[in-house]
């Protein structure tokens, strides 16, 4: 059977090209210890910035704060039609943090009771989809892949149309009750659009050190659930779990945090309870 695979996220013009060609400074030194920034330099920089946005598909605006759990954007369920697209869980996080392993465990734990579909996002490959199929997470026709061809966050935030189409197709074909979306590995500033994800999970792991939670960023601060994965490696990498716990609680304003070993199913009961609780509160599940 051919593996369902969608090339590129969104419309044809949503492919993202990186052409960072900024001419920020025009330095003309005439024996003096100063910098000359003329208006033509400023205008050319602005023109380059606008060209970058046009070619890239979106801008990378600076954030003034690391975000806030209490002030995060919440899903709006008043007009949400779960018969068109089931309750959607978005899973994000850096490369190698354990996102795909989490999807595998969720499919195994929830797939026996609920109708589930999965959409994975990769830049140029379908490795995550193939991993899930190879490990029999679900029947392979329920696992779709999108090749974003550019910044992973663009397909889950700026232009979510490709993911929405794939999810709605799964809904139409299998009458799904829960849908899972995995973002390509990205940085701490990446997060899901509420147009796509009803419940946002962000996965980090201890291998980056115990400083990661306090670095913040929308993924850590504004996700509905933060998972700190691979706790069994803490001693090996010199990470202090108590420090991670303290910093995560502070920056997330006591929002939900689960310390986990996803591969070993440690913490999975709590994770599934939080997901199902959110889906039931939204009216998506009874």
Swiss-Prot record:
Q: What protein name applies here?
A: Uncharacterized urease accessory protein ureG-like
GO cellular component terms, alphabetically, are: cytosol; nucleus
Q: Does the keyword Chaperone apply?
A: yes
Q: Cross-referenced HAMAP family, in alphabetical order?
A: UreG (MF_01389)
Q: Name one Pfam family in it.
A: cobW
Annotated region (Disordered) at 1-47
Q: Name one GO biological process term.
A: urea catabolic process
Residues that coordinate or bind GTP: 93-100
Per the UniProt entry, what species is this protein from, by scientific name? Answer: Schizosaccharomyces pombe (strain 972 / ATCC 24843)
- UniProt keyword list: Chaperone, Cytoplasm, GTP-binding, Nickel insertion, Nucleotide-binding, Nucleus
Q: What does this protein do?
A: Probably facilitates nickel incorporation.
Family membership noted in the UniProt record: Belongs to the SIMIBI class G3E GTPase family. UreG subfamily.
Checking InterPro entries in the record gives: CobW/HypB/UreG_nucleotide-bd, P-loop_NTPase, UreG
The record's subcellular locations are: Cytoplasm; Nucleus
Q: Which domain of life is it from?
A: Eukaryota
Q: Is GTP-binding given among the entry's keywords? A: yes
Q: Which GO terms describe its molecular function?
A: GTP binding; GTPase activity; nickel cation binding
Ranges of biased composition (kind: Basic and acidic residues): 9-26
Q: Specify the taxonomic lineage.
A: Eukaryota, Fungi, Dikarya, Ascomycota, Taphrinomycotina
């Amino acid at each position: 059977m051919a593996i369902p695979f969608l090339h590129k996220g969104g419309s044809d013009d949503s492919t993202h090209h990186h052409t960072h060609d900024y001419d920020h400074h025009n330095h003309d030194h005439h024996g003096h210890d100063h910098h000359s920034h003329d208006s033509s330099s400023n205008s050319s920089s602005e023109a380059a910035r606008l060209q970058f946005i046009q070619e890239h598909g979106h801008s990378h605006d600076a954030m003034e704060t690391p975000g806030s759990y209490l002030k995060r954007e919440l899903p709006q369920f008043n007009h949400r039609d779960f018969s068109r697209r089931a309750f959607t869980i978005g899973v994000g996080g850096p490369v190698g943090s354990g996102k795909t392993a989490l999807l595998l465990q969720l499919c195994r734990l929830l797939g026996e009771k609920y109708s589930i579909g999965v959409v994975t996002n990769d830049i140029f490959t379908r490795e995550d989809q193939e991993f899930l199929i190879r490990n029999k997470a679900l029947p392979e026709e329920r696992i779709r892949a999108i090749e974003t061809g550019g910044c992973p966050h663009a397909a889950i935030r700026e232009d979510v149309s490709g993911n929405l189409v794939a999810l709605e197709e799964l809904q139409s074909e299998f009458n799904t009750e829960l849908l899972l979306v995995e973002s390509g590995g990205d940085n701490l500033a990446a997060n899901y659009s509420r147009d796509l994800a009803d419940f946002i999970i962000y996965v980090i792991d201890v291998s980056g050190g115990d400083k990661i939670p306090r670095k913040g960023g929308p993924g850590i601060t504004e996700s509905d659930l933060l998972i700190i994965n691979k706790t069994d490696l803490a001693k090996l990498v010199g990470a202090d779990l108590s420090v991670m716990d303290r910093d995560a609680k502070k920056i997330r304003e006591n929002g939900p945090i689960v310390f986990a070993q996803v591969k070993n199913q440690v913490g999975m009961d709590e994770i599934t309870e939080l997901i199902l609780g959110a889906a039931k509160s939204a009216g998506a599940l009874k």
